[in-house]
Amino acid sequence: MDLTWVTEGRTTIAVPCQNPDVPFPPGTAPVFYNSRMALNRDSTVLVVRQTHPHSYLDAMAASGIRGCRVGYETGVPVTFNDRDQLAIDLITHNVQSLGIKADITCRDANSLMSDEKFGFVDLDPFGTPAPFIDAAIRSSGKYLGVTATDTAPLCGAHLKAGIRRYMARPLNTEYHTEVGLRILLGNVARHAAVYDKGITPLFCYAHEHFVRLHLQLKSSASAADKSIARLGYIHQCPKCPYRLEEQKFFPGIHTCPLCGASLTPTGPLWTGSTHDPNILAGMIEDAETFIAGDPSGLLKLLALCRDEPDISFSYDYHKLGKFYRLSPGPIDVLLNRLRDKGYRAGRVHYSGYGIKTDAPLEEIRDCISS
């Protein structure tokens, strides 16, 4: 296996050489490494630095970059696991090169997580994490990280696959990214409740081709009940921009008050907060000084998440203007007008044209046309 050295964050490891002349170079290497996921791993390092778990499991380690960064940049003891012996050989090489404290296992991830417990369990599979979530919850002592790259099923483009994997009905709307994030959160919350565990989102977001969750788990029936109480649905009008959030385990039947159409429900999904303000504030402060290289992209994401209103859906600013046949001005002007009227309003972290507000559509329209 031909290797090359890469530096990500403060960590330098060896990774297999890739063919740069194909559409997806990481797929050409004998052991997987995707440089496009560096921001994902940056955020994980910052969360681990805020939470200080006693141990960390990189359950599908591949090249080992995630676990190597956690071990080298936080000092937390890491267990690396992969079922591919080539990956294990590469991880061993990288661990020895970095001199970090680590255990390395070559097992099926579900089998390992069923047998052992870790302070922080991290799932970063190729594709859906759905087959691993149950075992990960049982294995986690306190913290859980989940990456999903199957955004088409999560966000409603592949409806049947989304229903099969996540036992929820996705919806391919203008805010489908938000739907995907909250469906994944809701799925984890339901799995956790089976074991009398509740979830608290620490920093959860959607970026480019993936959804990323960082969660704290609390073991108690009351914590599980509180999580279940935060499950609900978004009801979307198929004919106009009206939408309704409903915190219920089973969806009601609703009619659009503006045009009379039957609303389409999506869910069950998480309707609670997607981040912890204290964790996020600590991550922002840490990122400014700790993350090596240019942290501007990560800092922008963190700031957008910090300022994003705690609302389960968003509007596409341009589509609102088109629907109302108005020429919208700058987004920030609209947001300031809504805030001046006493409404919550802000940008979303996953779209340059997305806005969140609790203002009714009539008020939004009036503020656009002012």
UniProtKB/Swiss-Prot annotation:
Q: Which residues form the Trm1 methyltransferase domain?
A: 4-368
What's an example GO BP annotation here? tRNA N2-guanine methylation
Residues annotated as binding Zn(2+) are 237, 240, 256, 259
- Amino-acid positions noted as binding S-adenosyl-L-methionine in the UniProt annotation, renumbered to this chain: 41, 66, 82, 108-109
HAMAP family (UniProt xref):
tRNA_dimethyltr_TRM1 (MF_00290)
Q: What does this protein do?
A: Dimethylates a single guanine residue at position 26 of a number of tRNAs using S-adenosyl-L-methionine as donor of the methyl groups.
Q: Which PANTHER family match?
A: N 2 ,N 2 -DIMETHYLGUANOSINE TRNA METHYLTRANSFERASE, TRNA (GUANINE(26)-N(2))-DIMETHYLTRANSFERASE
Q: Which NCBIfam families match?
A: TRM1 (TIGR00308)
* Protein name as annotated: tRNA (guanine(26)-N(2))-dimethyltransferase
Natural source organism: Methanospirillum hungatei JF-1 (strain ATCC 27890 / DSM 864 / NBRC 100397 / JF-1)
Quote the gene name from the UniProt entry.
Answer: trm1
